[in-house]
Amino acid sequence: MSIDKSYCGFIAIVGRPNVGKSTLLNKLLGQKISITSRKAQTTRHRIVGIHTEGAYQAIYVDTPGLHMEEKRAINRLMNKAASSSIGDVELVIFVVEGTRWTLDDEMVLNKLRDGKAPVILAVNKVDNVQEKADLLPHLQFLASQMNFLDIVPISAETGLNVDTIAAIVRKHLPEATHHFPEDYITDRSQRFMASEIIREKLMRFLGAELPYSVTVEIERFVSNERGGYDINGLILVEREGQKKMVIGNKGAKIKTIGIEARKDMQEMFEAPVHLELWVKVKSGWADDERALRSLGYVDDL
């Protein structure tokens, strides 16, 4: 009797903030799991995205962007989460941006040089490079930095060459039993995903006005008799002025955030959602390691 082989492994997606790691993860999975925003540092937790195709199961770890500044407790914890992801995976996808190369990229590269896992270099946003003649010399420069498994120019936004990345990943998955059922796409709870959706809308609708010192706590997540969910979200900010910014003129801003978050939740949970949002000032939460632990920022370290 022949037993079908199965393949399964962990892949870390790493890179400095805002190079498109979350967009790449979402594209590899075929749907939105990790929040994306033009603001740097929007991924605060390691999110596991699971993609199963026949005998192959790829488990993606979406790290916070590794970055130089470690002054605040939240930044130290985010760097720790990103570094710990690199250590225990079969493969690393190192995402960089077009022809840009920064000290933060250099720092990530140095961490990868010390690691044992093979590294795919994904050069993202190549469709945005204005001077196409600059691209080839830059790719040659990158190739000289480390013995990469492969260098793939991609656009996570449009999907260009993302299938190439997926094919390389499949080829390097070790023979192993699958960790998750084939219909799983993330190991995160619905409660966690609800908070991520609200946080994405805050980033999207407040943009540059909003500091990083905002987080979301789901105080209530219960099934109701209508076959849907009642969800209460608490938005924590550090100052009174930030609270006014989130609420907006006559509550217009928080209403928009709530409407858009509810739409995404209904799509993700495939059920009606009744969502209520509040804003509360809790000064200094991003500097307070104990508060961060209570909000789940170190639950996976």
Curated annotation (Swiss-Prot):
CDD domains from the UniProt entry: Era, KH-II_Era
Gene Ontology BP annotations: ribosomal small subunit assembly
Region annotation G2: where it falls in the sequence: 41-45
PROSITE patterns in alphabetical order: G_ERA, KH_TYPE_2
General function of this protein: An essential GTPase that binds both GDP and GTP, with rapid nucleotide exchange. Plays a role in 16S rRNA processing and 30S ribosomal subunit biogenesis and possibly also in cell cycle regulation and energy metabolism.
Protein name: GTPase Era
Pfam family, any one: KH_2
GO cellular component: cytosol; plasma membrane
InterPro entries, per database record: G_ERA_dom (IPR030388), GTP-bd (IPR006073), GTPase_Era-like (IPR005662), KH_dom-like_a/b (IPR015946), KH_dom_type_2 (IPR004044), KH_sf_prok-type (IPR009019), P-loop_NTPase (IPR027417), Small_GTP-bd (IPR005225)
Gene3D superfamilies in alphabetical order: 3.30.300.20, P-loop containing nucleotide triphosphate hydrolases
PANTHER family given in the database record: GTPASE ERA, GTPASE ERA, MITOCHONDRIAL
Origin species: Shigella dysenteriae serotype 1 (strain Sd197)
Gene Ontology molecular functions: GTP binding; GTPase activity; ribosomal small subunit binding; small ribosomal subunit rRNA binding
G1: region residues: 15-22
Ranges for region G5: 154-156
Subunit-structure text: Monomer.
Residue span(s) of domain Era-type G: 7-175
Ranges that cross the membrane: none
Localization terms from the record: Cytoplasm; Cell inner membrane
Keywords of the record: Cell inner membrane, Cell membrane, Cytoplasm, GTP-binding, Membrane, Nucleotide-binding, Ribosome biogenesis, RNA-binding, rRNA-binding
Chain sites annotated for binding GTP: 15-22, 62-66, 124-127
